[in-house]
UniProtKB/Swiss-Prot annotation:
Organism: Baumannia cicadellinicola subsp. Homalodisca coagulata
Gene Ontology process terms (BP): translation
Stated family: Belongs to the universal ribosomal protein uS15 family.
SMART domains xrefs: Ribosomal_S15
UniProt gene name: rpsO
Protein name according to UniProt: Small ribosomal subunit protein uS15
Gene Ontology cellular-component annotations: cytosolic small ribosomal subunit
Annotated function: One of the primary rRNA binding proteins, it binds directly to 16S rRNA where it helps nucleate assembly of the platform of the 30S subunit by binding and bridging several RNA helices of the 16S rRNA. Forms an intersubunit bridge (bridge B4) with the 23S rRNA of the 50S subunit in the ribosome.
Pfam families in the cross-refs: Ribosomal_S15
Keywords: Ribonucleoprotein, Ribosomal protein, RNA-binding, rRNA-binding
Highest taxon of source: Bacteria
Amino acid sequence: MSLSFNTKAKIIADFGRNNYDSGSTAVQIALLTAQINHLQDHFAVHKKDHHSRRGLLRIVSQRRKLLVYFKNKDLASYTDLIERLNLRR
């Protein structure tokens, strides 16, 4: 249940420094957030899919670690990213 190529390209263009910047922290967090939102829609239909839920928890944990790193590295960009992604932090 990964994101489509076009969705990834749009996220990279929106949050990256250029169209090929898929490795920066902001882009990684945005991609993980999109994948989490996609999986939440999946779980609305498939409530008993516990194997995928474990994968979701792994992705959420990875995003949380990246958010902590990004907050310590660049607070201004962190707050901007949180507002753009509508996260509750």
